[in-house]
Amino acid sequence: MKIVVDENIPLADALFGDLGEIIRKPGREISSADVAEADALLVRSVTRVNADLLTGSKVKFVGTCTIGTDHLDKEFLAEAGIRFASAPGCNAQGVVQYDLAALAHLGYLARDIRVGIIGCGNVGGSLHRALTGMGVTCVCYDPFLTQDQNADLADWDALFTCDVICVHTPLTRSGPYPTHHMLSTPFFRAMRDGALLLNAGRGEVIDNRALKAYLQGDNSNHLSVVLDVWEGEPAIDAELAPLVKIATPHIAGYSFEGKTNGSLMIYEALAEFLGVNATERSARVAAVKAQAYGAAEPLDADDLVTAILATHPITRDDKALRDQLDQLPAGFDALRKGYPVRREFSHYQLTSAQIPANVTALGFSLDSAK
């Protein structure tokens, strides 16, 4: 069989090589001609998978190595009898690491703060657990959850009591709670004075034009902003980026583990679709995982902020995007393609006796001999 694979999907040979012939393509450039004779298509969020791409092709399986699925026309896939799979939660810990690195760099973790989280699914829920494990008070807004599922659920207006609001919703344009442009000028105005708005979910959830106008209107003292996701990627608004505190090229979930987990989850789905037995699938996943992840790395840090920023030097990513603002849209994609290896908290064993035990809530391990 032929498997067309986004060239940025890691471990493609190790995982999919025995299942068929691998044909690598740049994700944004995958065309109907590329997939005409393919049996399976493996993508990331940059590839629009719809009738225009797949009509007339032999594709019977589509896998996206991402949490989000708004780039897939799921209705078309179902009608066409094409199986599809995603990787929910694959990079949740990488996004949590990004959020905490932003808060650490901007000084919020050194203060007594109240954090609002919009959307408490895989990513938002992981962030909620990490923050509460650190003793941070959280306010969660998610109309699809109940109080039994999340004790910190609150109504929309409770968000405006928060010092920080983190956005982790999917992108939806219909249904009872559409998220497209959910946050615009009235929301910005209602936020607490000096608050931080952080979006590492989907760019279109925030009206970027309205945000730019608000920040250009001398409201930067009222509102600080961190953006990892943008409307119109990769052709983002180069005039908005200089107005925010941290600007990065959609790499929050680009941890090594996050990308690897996505590949592993889609391998499981494709192999099952092809009839590979569970024992063989599990053995392949275990072998690839052990080789890819390796042993824990010691990290000497005397406090939590230092530890977090040692694992994710977020100012590096911010500078990289600012340096490419005159090279958009190509520069945006180049940064994502060439993103350096970033390991999650779980890869590190903290060796300092000064570090608080609650860092294990983030996934760090502690040196038992300390």
Curated annotation (Swiss-Prot):
- Catalytic machinery residues: 202, 233, 250 (proton donor)
Cellular component GO terms, alphabetical: cytosol
Using the record, list the residue span of the signal peptide; answer none if the entry has no such feature: none
Location in or out of the cell = Cytoplasm
Could you tell me which pathway this protein works in?
Answer: Cofactor biosynthesis; pyridoxine 5'-phosphate biosynthesis; pyridoxine 5'-phosphate from D-erythrose 4-phosphate: step 2/5
Q: What is this protein called?
A: Erythronate-4-phosphate dehydrogenase
Catalytic activities: 4-phospho-D-erythronate + NAD(+) = (R)-3-hydroxy-2-oxo-4-phosphooxybutanoate + NADH + H(+)
Reported function: Catalyzes the oxidation of erythronate-4-phosphate to 3-hydroxy-2-oxo-4-phosphonooxybutanoate.
Q: Name one GO molecular function term.
A: 4-phosphoerythronate dehydrogenase activity
InterPro entries for this protein: D-isomer_2_OHA_DH_cat_dom, D-isomer_DH_CS, D-isomer_DH_NAD-bd, Erythronate-4-P_DHase, Erythronate-4-P_DHase_dimer, NAD(P)-bd_dom_sf, PdxB_dimer_sf
Keywords of the record:
Cytoplasm, NAD, Oxidoreductase, Pyridoxine biosynthesis
Please tell me the species this chain comes from: Teredinibacter turnerae (strain ATCC 39867 / T7901)
Subunit comment: Homodimer.
EC class, as a word, reads oxidoreductase
Query: Which EC number(s) are documented for this chain?
Result: 1.1.1.290
